[in-house]
């Protein structure tokens, strides 16, 4: 929770960076937040296929500053053909992506079906909504406002015949 502010400032999650190896190697001052929205699969070692037509990358400074480095990096990605924006609240963007993962990953893993087929089941669709609602409440408790409702978030992915990476990993024995 570096550059987070409030009572969470400086708290660590050792499970995410055991021994703070990445933190020491990269440093907080050189860290940019980022969120990727893309339906991808590993075709072979070192080869990733992107199947979504609406892929995008969102970057942002941890403290919300609109820095020259974030803008410059976003422009470089755009020049390379990847839609990219700079967010004034990257932490809320991360929460938004996490909400998608909360709904899609576990349910698709349990059913071993893609998102579209999983969410076509009314019971599973309802479970996904509940997971996102719980995530929204947790984000709000952490002071983060996610821009769309649970229904809107589920509707965005409900028609996608994509298998989340956690299901792809299971199917490949990883």
Question: Which sequence ranges carry the predicted segments?
Answer:
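Short Gly/charged-rich anion-binding patches and loops
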Residues: 17, 72, 134
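A generic secondary-structure signal marking the coil-to-beta-strand transition
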Residues: 29-30, 55, 73, 82, ...
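Short beta-strand and adjoining strand-loop segment in the mid-core
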Residues: 3-12, 20, 46-74, 125
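Rossmann-like NAD(P)(H) cofactor-binding subdomain of soluble oxidoreductases
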Residues: 1-44
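Helical "substrate-binding/catalytic lid" subdomain
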Residues: 83-174
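ATP/pyrophosphate-binding catalytic subdomain of soluble kinases
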Residues: 62-66, 70, 75-82, 86-92
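Glycine-rich beta-alpha junction loops
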Residues: 35-40, 63, 90-94, 102
């Amino acid at each position: 929770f570096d550059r987070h502010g409030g009572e969470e400032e400086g708290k660590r999650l050792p499970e995410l960076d055991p021994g703070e190896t990445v933190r020491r190697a990269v440093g907080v001052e050189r860290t940019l937040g980022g969120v990727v929205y893309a339906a991808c699969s590993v075709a072979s070692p070192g080869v990733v296929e992107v199947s979504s037509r609406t892929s995008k990358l969102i970057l942002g400074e941890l403290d919300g500053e609109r820095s020259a480095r974030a803008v410059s990096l976003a422009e470089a990605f755009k020049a390379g053909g990847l839609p990219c924006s700079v967010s004034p609240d990257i932490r809320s963007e991360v929460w938004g992506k996490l909400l998608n993962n909360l709904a899609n990953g576990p349910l698709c893993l349990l059913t071993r079906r893609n998102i579209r087929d999983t969410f076509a089941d009314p019971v599973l669709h309802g479970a996904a909504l509940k997971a996102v609602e719980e995530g929204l409440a947790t984000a709000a408790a952490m002071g983060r406002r996610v821009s769309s409702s649970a229904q809107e978030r589920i509707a965005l992915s409900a028609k996608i015949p994509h298998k989340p990476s956690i299901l792809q990993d299971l199917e490949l024995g990883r």
